[in-house]
Amino acid sequence: MKFAYTILYVENVHQTIAFYASASGFQKKFSTPEGDYGELISGETTLAFASLQLAETNFSKGFQKSSLQQKPFGIELAFTTDNIETDFQKAIAAGAIEEEAVVQKPWGQKVGYLRDINGFLIEVCTPIQ
């Protein structure tokens, strides 16, 4: 088995792809003509987005929608960078909301937390040495 995708269910797939492309520099890989699913080239694991309407057809018992008006889910997308301060501010300029400022952890790694335009938690960090 291989971990292949992280799929976030979002209000607007096209806006979310545009946000992540602007915030991270990732390129769009694919999107459906209907705009209900799309993928970004983000490294070894594909970062994908599907519409809330598609989620409703996939999950007959319902699902929890992410929202900026609620606390973030207990899961995050983590992106490593050697230019954390620059990339953290780039994401904010693209529309991310700062959740926790960049700090240096006791083990030497720098870490900061953001929320994306849908309320999902993003960690921007330096690689662990």
Regions found by a protein language model. Name each.
Residues 16, 20-21, 91, 119:
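Conserved active-site tyrosine of GNAT-family acetyltransferases
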Residues 1-5, 27-82, 88-115, 126-129:
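Vicinal oxygen chelate
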Residues 117-123:
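Short, contiguous alpha-helical
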Residues 10-12, 106:
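Conserved beta-strand-loop-alpha-helix junction that forms the acyl-donor binding cleft
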Residues 13, 84-85:
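Residues at or immediately preceding the N-termini of alpha-helices
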